[in-house]
A protein has these predicted regions:
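Alpha-helical transmembrane segments and their immediate juxtamembrane cytosolic regions
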Residues: 1-258
């Protein structure tokens, strides 16, 4: 298979994977679930928080940065003005984001447009500097405890992946991919252990009566922060595992769109 074709396939598969995860992440708010009473509800919410919340949002944000790189440089190769085309797209995204905010406040499209606009500035920056800036901004975003603040760092890191041509050459670095997957697996396992140890039920009514409300609030805040802190490690594991599995024809056939 040609590298360019494989690159497009990998990104398309990852986009579909990220969108599926985002649907799961938003399903509770979409169907307006306000109480979790049954055991099934509790287990579902537990693993929704541990395995899904903030993870697929992170993957999609990273893909936005990669997509920006591809769009920008394809436009330059076609000898058209990439800045004008991108600004037009961002304005459309901003409009859609504003409309989306009316029906589902707090969703990411509006923030994508706001953060995506200054992304043009990083097209003038060396890839090594972008890598450092992206990692710093992502770390600051994680420490803030709010997944929305992941966006700037992930956008820049996605663009940096494009600058390093990793979206084209990822399968040319088989050993590095295996080592990265191994390390990310360790990070994933540690994250799972930590999240299970600090897990708190989604409502005070569901915890032991011996636990005071004040203690519950503190424990829940800790668990909520840990969801955000561990999200980059879990997201990285998902991406690397998914990319690695796509090396095999059987996995590609299983995941291929209908």
């Amino acid at each position: 298979m040609e590298p360019t074709k494989k690159r497009i396939e990998v990104l398309d598969y990852l986009r579909g994977f990220a969108l599926l995860g985002i649907i799961f992440a938003n399903i509770v708010s979409i169907i307006h679930v306000t109480e979790h009473t049954g055991n099934v509800d509790i287990v579902y919410m537990k693993y929704l928080n541990i395995l899904v919340e903030a993870k697929f949002f992170s993957i999609f944000s990273l893909l936005f940065g990669i997509g920006f790189y591809i769009f920008f440089h394809n436009a330059k190769q076609k000898d058209v003005n990439p800045y004008f085309l991108y600004l037009r797209r961002i304005l459309i995204l901003l409009l859609l984001g504003l409309i989306h905010q009316i029906f589902q406040p707090g969703e990411a499209l509006f923030f994508y447009a706001i953060v995506g606009l200054p992304l043009l500035l990083f097209t003038f920056v060396d890839k090594r500097i972008n890598l450092v800036l992206g990692l710093i901004l992502l770390a600051l975003g994680v420490l803030s405890g709010n997944k929305i603040t992941f966006i700037p760092g992930l956008f820049i890191l996605g663009y940096t992946i494009g600058q390093y041509d990793l979206h084209k050459t990822i399968y040319h670095h088989a050993r590095a991919l295996r080592i990265s997957l191994l390390l990310s697996t360790i990070g994933f396992i540690i994250s799972m252990v930590v999240l299970h140890l600090y897990y708190v039920a989604p409502s005070y009514d569901l915890v032991e009566s011996t636990l005071s409300n004040e203690t519950y609030v503190k424990m829940y805040e800790t668990f909520s922060n840990l969801i955000v802190y561990t999200a980059p490690f879990i997201s990285l594991f998902y991406v690397l595992l998914f990319v690695y599995l796509l090396k095999f024809d059987g996995a590609k056939k299983l995941l291929r769109p209908l």
